[in-house]
Amino acid sequence: MASTAKEGSELTLAVIGCGTMGIAILSGILASLDEIHAPNSQSSETDETPSKLPTKFIACVRSPKGAEKIKKALSPYKTPVKIIQSDNVTACREADVVLLGCKPYMAEGILGEEGMVDALKGKLLISILAGVPAEQIYGYMYGKTPVNPEKEGLCQVVRAMPNTASGIRESMTVIATSSPPLSATTSSLITWIFKRIGDVVQLPAATMDASTALCGSGPAFFALILEAAIDGAVAMGLPRAEAQRMAAQTMKGAAGLVLSGEHPALLKDKVTTPGGCTIGGLMVLEEGGVRGTVARAVREATVVASQLGKGVQGVNGTRF
């Protein structure tokens, strides 16, 4: 990673557009750092630790209300976070690594601010913007995609898609592979950052819109299914608080079994006995087209994500 940080110095991470997702990511990183530096810490690094880690943090927002929200959310952590209002260029100038977390339609304006290209020169820019490919971000800054930005001393853009579970360090983050490939140092740093807030996979850039739909929108999809199950249980006499706890733990347990290697179809079959209540419920779900509807929701969200990055307005209101 080309960086303005001096050899052996600490890295500074700045979050531009530090809203809900930015706060969640910072929360996960800061919680991890607190664990690492705690007395008698039992924390162990299972992945290769980069030679330089972010230890200083900047959060950039537009309003006093946003600044107050960040202060409140990050106050439990020992590592301080510097908050800058309405001065993205200064935040980027002071940083070595920049996380771009604004709304997709705001990216062009932010990256086009006077002095921004110079402030980002030689630095790493991690974009978590839905539907905005790295080529588009390069276009905002340079008018084209550089052949090899790291060797040319330009800003190096990497696209990543975490989700809202970052705040409890259970995110599923997808990192887009780059061409030419990232240096080992840069790749290690990006993986380390997102490993602090959950699991990480790397996939080709062409899959990022689908990854946005599955991992970024997925928590909302699963929450809707969870809510429906809770309502059904309440309708049959269970207290809502207990029904919510039971349903959430059941979903968590099913996910844990799949993550341990169990195929979803086999898991379903293991629970299903001839003439039993499970197959009866499954038949209702199949008759209602739940399988196809959920799959279509992921497909639709993929298309919408691709259009949002292009600045298309009202996408959801024009599709059938």
From Swiss-Prot:
GO annotation terms (biological process): L-proline biosynthetic process
Keyword Oxidoreductase in annotation: yes
EC number from the UniProt entry: 1.5.1.2
Pathway info: Amino-acid biosynthesis; L-proline biosynthesis; L-proline from L-glutamate 5-semialdehyde: step 1/1
Annotated Pfam families: F420_oxidored (PF03807), P5CR_dimer (PF14748)
GO MF annotation terms: pyrroline-5-carboxylate reductase activity
Similarity comment: Belongs to the pyrroline-5-carboxylate reductase family.
Protein name according to UniProt: Pyrroline-5-carboxylate reductase
Annotated organism of origin: Lophium arboricola
